[in-house]
Every structure is written in structure tokens, then in C-alpha cells.
Amino acid sequence: MLNAVGREIPEEILERTGKEVFQGNNYKDGKAFQKASPKVTPVMRNDHDKMVKDIHEALVKCNAHDGMTVSFHHHFREGDLVVCMVMEEIHKMGFKNITLSASSLGKAHDALVPMIEDGTIVNIESSGVRGKIGDAISHGKLKGLATMRSHGGRVRAIETGETHVDIAFIGAPSCDEYGNCSGMGGKTNCGVLSYAYVDAEMADYVVAVTDCLVDYPNYPAEINQTKVDYVCVVDQIGIPEKIATGAAKPTTDQRKILMAEYCTQVVANTPYFKDGFSYQTGVGGASIASTISLSKIMEEKNIHMGLGVGGLTKPMCELLDRGLARKLVDTQDFDLDAVNNVTSNPNHFPISAGEYASPMNKGAFVNKLDYVILASLEVDTHFNCNVVVGSDGIITGAQGGHPDTAQGAKCTIVIAPLLQGRIPAICTDVTTVTTPGESVDIVVTDYGVAVNPRRPDLLEALKAADCVPLKTIEELRDIAYSIVGEPEKVQFGDRIVGIIEARDGTVMDVVREVKLSLSAKIE
């Protein structure tokens, strides 16, 4: 069946998953639904002990079984040790047919590949995957299905009961003996625990895993004692230098600096740039450089950011500290400065992933964004974006909040160099659609800026300002093809190994097993 972005979704997938095809961004707007009800094991005795000696005991007490769904957050990023620690014990205990539900998976989890191959893990639900897991899925080693969801889409799936989490393991930088968890106060601080809120709320059992047990009560707690069944102390939950790698530095790449300048000019010359505007940006070099250059214009024009949303880095936190931003709401911290700013600035507020981006609540923060600056592996002439599948057909990225913020913001700006190595980033059709073109307003490249024809108001504003070289998206594609030629299409097999969910739970696209790799890599 053809969906709203022109992708053919096989009936077998719709029957297998019970899903509908994507029918546009606002298909489910205003349609009431019934939230799932969590199972709660009450604690009434005042002598109840939540402490367990190890992960093995936690699994036994949580009634671990074949076919269960276990969940994790990814706030420790490439420094995460919790996922592999727990899955190794599950493997050792002989459990099979596990569904692994994580807010994201990366190279830190490469050790899970043998568990995929032997049937310990049969389904994966994640924002996306990087590293060897993505390669394994793309080559058909996962026996079930990989379901890629946005951050908001994951919250929706768990709250509606589509994903039922049997045991949630929440890595906590600090925790007390009764389960009050914080992203701060330990030796592996990650700032916030936003992605784990929904797991703590909805899972049958919740296990806090910490390497820093502190005195009761560990307050303020992001995840409190009323949600946690057991507490397990281990030697190490993360590698600090891989959790937050220090201050993000502005890029010295001249191509990225040029795109950053174009992006800054686009923001500064469109109607939403006025005192009190709201803004979110990514963590790439061009995005960071754009935030820094935008701050200079804000100072010159005495314009203050009313709200910054993130995924946060040092430059955004500096805007807050300098008084150029009034408030930051935080779902993830990407460097040490952002981590520390959580507690050092009283106007820096942790929020849940649901508050941030869920499409199925009564209004998420993404809906109040004026601007969002995003990156993309590919953008096509319909303004569709691909952030998950590489040009070689291998799953190599994650949706993250890309579809959520792109739909929510009044002005969605996507930055992409015209060429990624020898591969055109602007093309006729993306390999896989993750964010629909109806969500994307402006594409910024090093060869010019294209405005979606859906937004004549933005095009007129930029024409009037004469601040950036304007091109059509087709012109940008043609320039790319004239330099490196039109790329060959990846040869996929028939088997579907994954689905790309739209944030409302409908099917945006499918990912097929790679038949022939072109050995073209995104640089």
C-alpha cells in the first residue's frame, strides 16, 4: 500500500505489525486514545529491602523469562556499560527471544551481535542503531524485526501499550537504597534521565543500576522511589570520558562554517526571529557554529531567546548563563558543560522525553519551537530526509528527535553538505524516508539554500533580505549530480529487516536486507 510519502508498504508488514501506513503528519491529531495501565507491585511493609546483590538476583526477582521485553536509556551514550552488562547476564541465564527496547543503541553495544545471531535477542526497538548492530540487522541476522522510532514515538509506543516493558533497567549516576535516581551526584554524571521516565512509569518491574549509592533521600530525584522495585550497585555503569567528552568546539571546516553562516542568516531574516523566540539545534560542527554566530546578532539587536530546547551543548548553556536565553528545557546533555549546567543554573530544567516530543499527549515542547536546526544524511527533491540508513544501505544512524522537532517547529532548517564524500546528499529520492518533506521548510547546503514550495512566506522573506544564495532543491540536486554523477541505487533483497515508524505509529518506510553494498560510506 502506498503511503503519504510515496513509499510502498507491503501488506504483510501491515498485517504482521497491526499498523497503518503513514497518512500525513496530523492524521491522528485530536483523536482520543486510552493509555495502557502499568502493573504495580505495592510495598507496604516498612522493613522492605529493595537492594539486590547483583543483576542475576534482580532478574530472578523480576520474574525474567523467555520472550520478555527489557528496556534501557542511552544517556551514557558511547560510554554506556549497563545494556551489555544486563544482556550478558540474560544470555548466561539462557533466556531467548528477547525484545530489546532502548532509546538508542550505538557502538558501545557491539558486543550484542552474537546474542542477535544466536536468538537471544530477536527484536529490537530503538531510535536507531550505529556500529556492528546496524550492520548485523542490515545483513539479515536479526530473526525478528528492528523497529526504529523517534524519541517522541517511543514514548507513544510504551504509553499506548504497543510496547509492553517487562523489566526496565535504569542506569543512575546516583541512587539511594530506596530507588531515588538522579542524573547527577555520582562519578558517571550524564545530567538528566529524561528518556527513562516513561520506562519507570510503565514497566512491570524497574531496576535502578548505579555505581554511586548515596544516603537516603537522594533528592531532588528525577525518577523517584515510587517507581523503582529494586536497586543494584555495580562497579561501573559508564565510562565518563565517553559520556561527556568535554566542551564542544566550533568547527574549523570552512564548508561547515559557510553553512553555519547561511543558517544564521536564514534565522535572522525570517519572521520568527524576535524577542522571546524558541530554538533547538543539533550537536554537529555547523550547528554549533551557527548558534555561536547567532548569539552575536542577538546581542546586536537586543533579542533574547525565550526558550532553548535540547539535546544541549556548551554554546546553548552559555546563552543561558549570559542572559541571552531565559530558560532551557533539557532531555539530553552532550558535553560536560551542559551536564554541569543542569545544577549550576536555576533556569535549566530537566524534562521527560514525553514532555519534549510525544505526539500523543496534550502538547509537547516541540510544538512550541520557532526554529529547529537539524542535520541529515540525505534530502530529496520532495524535502524528505533520511537520517537512519547510509548510502550503502546499512543502518547507521538514529531518528532521535528529528521527526518530532521537524513537525513541531514553525521553521525547520536542515543542514546538509551538497556532497558527503563522493555521495550526493541532495538527491532525487532518499534511500529511506525518516522525516517527511511536509515537515521540512528550508535546506541549507554549502552551494546554496532551498526553500520548500509549501513556504512561500519564508521564500519571500529571504528574497527581500538578499542574505543567502537561493536555489531550488532540484538545482542543488543537479549541481551535485554534475560533480559526482547520479549514484547507483543500493541493491536490496526481498526480506524486510526493519521498519521506520512515523511518530504517530504509522509506517513511514521499510528497511530491507542489503543484497549488494556499494561500499560507499558517509564521511
What are these regions (language model features)?
Residues 1-523:
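Conserved alpha/beta enzyme-core scaffold
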